[in-house]
Amino acid sequence: MLLEARTYALYLAIATKIGHANAQTGPVPVVGMTAGIDQVTGKLPLRMNIETLEQEGGPMWDLLIRGLDALQNKPEDDQRSHFAIAGIHGMPYAPYNGVGPVPGGSGGGYCPHQSPQLIPWHRAFLALYEQTLGDEAQRLALEYTDNDASAYREASQKLRLPYWDWASDPTLPPSTTQENITVNGPEGEINLHNPLYSYRWQTYPLNETQFPGHGEIGPETTRQGGGNDMTKFIKDSVYRTFSSTTTWDEMASMAGSGSSFESPHNAIHNSVGGSFLSLDLTSFDTLFMLHHCNLDRLSAIWTASHHDTLQVQPFTSQGLYSTAKGEIITADSPLKPFYQADGRTFHTGRTVATTEAFGYTYPDILGGDQGRKEVIAQINRLYRGLSTTEDWAAASTSRREWFVEIEVDRADLPLPCNIDVYLGDRFAGRTSLLSMPKTGIAYDELSLSRAVKSLDVHDNEPGGTERRLMNDLHVRVTKGGTTLDPRDIPSLHINVVGEEVTPPSSESEFPSYSNRTTATVIYVPTLHVARADTDD
């Protein structure tokens, strides 16, 4: 619904007042980190796994922690502070780079979710944070002298944000769970509040004008746990997206049918809980940067294995802070509020299509001479778990695999929430929906393979396995500690899908899928009744 003119005028006045300090200094162009790139070979510095970076320690680790600490302690009205950059995502709904709200906007943050812009928008967002962190690291490196000087200067040039590979292990990295941390300063060890653990609000209690409805939260960002109970389901979801999607639009967003990286990304948000549950607050937790670096990484690996970098189909926006509801989004639509180097032209999906645009890469995609086959082999090693000849031989027989398709209108749900799928009492997978957008059809696809295996289903009668699955399948829709009856959600549609899966002939190939069948689940009181259809 479009904002009424009077409401919009009042909202604009409040937002302009809040964002006035930021607007005074002029736009901050998003160029990423330009330092540390080999001027001869063009080799790019790596965004590293946070656990690898911590284990290696040394100057880069020291500068990461000290740099993040410096950003968190910058004044809130500094455009280059942690507070100001994190605030672009959700609250305090204030203009950044002078880019204000528009009539027909959502009244929320700038960030798109359930949209093909999800990944490119966050790529620009992370690049802004990374270049600001790099500036702090290079400043801090100058404090080190004597034998340490050159090592810290070199590390400051190559420092990039690390990622948390929740697709391999969704438990919180150890370095993010300790409240205090010790690193090496120019004159010895320094004990700090760990910036990877939480962000402490400088103004507390929170300003109700900036954070309406959040005045009662604690003095720092919080978490409730991690995804340690979802390791296999998340890995399956990620691998299914790598191996079955063929276009950017499918891979990037839950706005279309099939699996996507947005789904496990959402599951991590909801499982971590605390501040991570709220799209208004989540980006203030530095863990958010690590989380989204991994989403960016997965998309970059997908691009390297599929040679596809751009949104294909136009998408109708549900409305954002500076984007009107109904606006048609393409790969050339602006990623507000992120300007290119000229400070006047917005980035688009096209200008941020590669990691090279912002001066970094990932260990999984080392360069142009690394072919698609090597990237696929790495995907298979990391996420399918088949890394030896014996493993591949054991998986060489074609078989029928089973999936659940989920479709639901977000407007029918109390967001954020989870839709958990079970076979009998065996957890099979989860579709997680975040608090925004409030409307729009969400799609997901979850693997039933592990749950089917645990049920020891070996029914050779035609259609027998499918009927067994339909009888045993049920879902739970939960928000916090409350469970909803699926029959009270009229738009919720559940399909059981079967596909013939032919394993790859080598580790450098994906499996192929064929002979797809679909059975629609209809909820009648406590029974599950199926009507079987076959897709063309």
Functional labels for PLM-detected ranges:
Residues N22-D536:
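C-terminal accessory segments of proteins
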